[in-house]
């Protein structure tokens, strides 16, 4: 078995695993630097940080179930002090997240009080083929419970999600597990209940501080678990000067000139996700205008 002191080897990793004698599949993910990189450029309230961590882990686990190249967006929109929380991840486990806050959010504020009247929207976008979008009612106390209900309703698959956020050794961390009965119909409710009962005993410090192999052994030492190679997880925004230029081209020349005059001849565009600044002076703007068709 892996030594507990080596837990960092599985930081920012996602694992898939199967049970040899039970038709249930599993996933495990832990976000360390990925989560920290997401929070570093924002001063989100603690409750929003925790919610984003929960959504990021859920998105990683969801994208790991994809059988095609593409991405998944998990988005909350509401009329409460948390106007928007959005996470986007792809099949390469590249992920980004952002939130928009308009009002006071206390540390222990509930999901419903943060969001008010709102919905959870999941968008699945294959690189090839049609997009699928599902709208989920936020009628459960947590996003995790709402997503479990989504799996049962949309895919008719029994699914357990265990997601925790917090700190480990003084640093933010978010981690989670997914258990799902196999879609081929060979799994039994009894097998699923047995494994989910064991998974529910997991402690925060185990999710945050153990390598995947050791954690699974502690939970399922009487089972034969086939653990597949890890996939790296990383924060990846995807913004660029080119994309900022394209956004400017959506504005009329007159509006651009007004912005230039107001900001002393320089436009500063900041990425809402990662905080990167893109600057355009008058010369760059004139060159950009000349590219209009």
Curated annotation (Swiss-Prot):
Gene name linked to the record: hslO
Lineage: Bacteria, Pseudomonadati, Pseudomonadota, Gammaproteobacteria, Pasteurellales
Keyword entries, A-Z: Chaperone, Cytoplasm, Disulfide bond, Redox-active center, Zinc
Family to which this protein belongs: Belongs to the HSP33 family.
S-S bonds: 237-239, 271-274
Organism: Haemophilus influenzae (strain ATCC 51907 / DSM 11121 / KW20 / Rd)
GO biological process terms on file: protein refolding
GO molecular function, one term: unfolded protein binding
GO (cellular component) term, any one: cytoplasm
Official protein name in the record: 33 kDa chaperonin
Post-translational modification, as annotated: Under oxidizing conditions two disulfide bonds are formed involving the reactive cysteines. Under reducing conditions zinc is bound to the reactive cysteines and the protein is inactive.
Described function: Redox regulated molecular chaperone. Protects both thermally unfolding and oxidatively damaged proteins from irreversible aggregation. Plays an important role in the bacterial defense system toward oxidative stress.
Superkingdom: Bacteria
Subcellular location(s) per record: Cytoplasm
InterPro entries in the cross-refs: Heat_shock_Hsp33, Heat_shock_Hsp33_C, Heat_shock_Hsp33_N, Hsp33_helix_hairpin_bin_dom_sf
